[in-house]
Amino acid sequence: MELVRQNNPLIHCMTNDVVMNFTANGLLAIGASPVMAFSAAETEDMASVADALLLNIGTPSNEGVDSMVLAGKAANRAGKPVIFDPVGVGATPFRNEISKRILNEVDVAVVRGNAGEIAALLGQAGTVKGVDGKINADVKELCLQAAKALRTVVVVTGEVDAVSNGEQLVAVANGHEWLTKVVGTGCLLGGVIAAYAAVQPNSLVDAAVEALAFYGVCAEQAYEQTKKEGIGSFQQTFLNELGNMTDEKAAALKRVEQIC
């Protein structure tokens, strides 16, 4: 986190309409600089100068995906990490098609999704209702399989998060269920992973693990402060924690297990 705050990475967020404000505020809180550029007239230029690119298909359109692919290729040429959040993949054929297109045409550094979304990328049967994926599977094994199949770093989020590059497998147990009651927390996590990847581009597993642990600790601390008040207070306090949390405190509270 100190690296993020010191370097103030520019994160090009091609994210969905529902979460743009929350994503921008969350990235500002951790010390990154968000920019939202969607037009095909400028996405390549913006992706080239940004420190990382987030592609999120929460509110997809054909034109939007065309712009995402242009931006992704530009980020690849510039050597900038691309984070892909396949929101709701598995729910409709359209989301399946555009996810395949992005993965086929863009060199994605990290894929982040819930178990249902990651299973859908592998063509496995799951249940995706809206953007909430539910599947009966070993999340850790799913993560390892997906990383091997997609040949990239995969983050599977859930009660316990998992990160793998196909060889290493790490579990992160931090977090709180109230995150699922605030729209946009999963999408913001993609942006936070992008910020960490921007300052640790050669250690993407470590970047993802540290981002997850930091994010989860912030959620736990926010819950402890607001559990008698409710979700609205939790959301505000969570943003405060993102801005106030130190590496030292997060390190003391993180629950990370290296599985292999």
Curated annotation (Swiss-Prot):
<keyword id="KW-0067">ATP-binding</keyword>
<dbReference type="InterPro" id="IPR029056">
    <property type="entry name" value="Ribokinase-like"/>
</dbReference>
<dbReference type="GO" id="GO:0009228">
    <property type="term" value="P:thiamine biosynthetic process"/>
</dbReference>
<keyword id="KW-0460">Magnesium</keyword>
<comment type="function">
    <text>Catalyzes the phosphorylation of the hydroxyl group of 4-methyl-5-beta-hydroxyethylthiazole (THZ).</text>
</comment>
<dbReference type="Pfam" id="PF02110">
    <property type="entry name" value="HK"/>
</dbReference>
<keyword id="KW-0547">Nucleotide-binding</keyword>
<keyword id="KW-0479">Metal-binding</keyword>
<keyword id="KW-0784">Thiamine biosynthesis</keyword>
<feature type="binding site">
    <location>
        <position position="36"/>
    </location>
    <ligand>
        <name>substrate</name>
    </ligand>
</feature>
<dbReference type="GO" id="GO:0005524">
    <property type="term" value="F:ATP binding"/>
</dbReference>
<feature type="binding site">
    <location>
        <position position="157"/>
    </location>
    <ligand>
        <name>ATP</name>
    </ligand>
</feature>
<protein>
    <recommendedName>
        <fullName>Hydroxyethylthiazole kinase</fullName>
        <ecNumber>2.7.1.50</ecNumber>
    </recommendedName>
</protein>
<keyword id="KW-0418">Kinase</keyword>
<feature type="binding site">
    <location>
        <position position="184"/>
    </location>
    <ligand>
        <name>substrate</name>
    </ligand>
</feature>
<keyword id="KW-0808">Transferase</keyword>
<dbReference type="GO" id="GO:0000287">
    <property type="term" value="F:magnesium ion binding"/>
</dbReference>
<dbReference type="GO" id="GO:0004417">
    <property type="term" value="F:hydroxyethylthiazole kinase activity"/>
</dbReference>
<dbReference type="GO" id="GO:0009229">
    <property type="term" value="P:thiamine diphosphate biosynthetic process"/>
</dbReference>
<dbReference type="InterPro" id="IPR000417">
    <property type="entry name" value="Hyethyz_kinase"/>
</dbReference>
<feature type="binding site">
    <location>
        <position position="112"/>
    </location>
    <ligand>
        <name>ATP</name>
    </ligand>
</feature>
<comment type="pathway">
    <text>Cofactor biosynthesis; thiamine diphosphate biosynthesis; 4-methyl-5-(2-phosphoethyl)-thiazole from 5-(2-hydroxyethyl)-4-methylthiazole: step 1/1.</text>
</comment>
<comment type="similarity">
    <text>Belongs to the Thz kinase family.</text>
</comment>
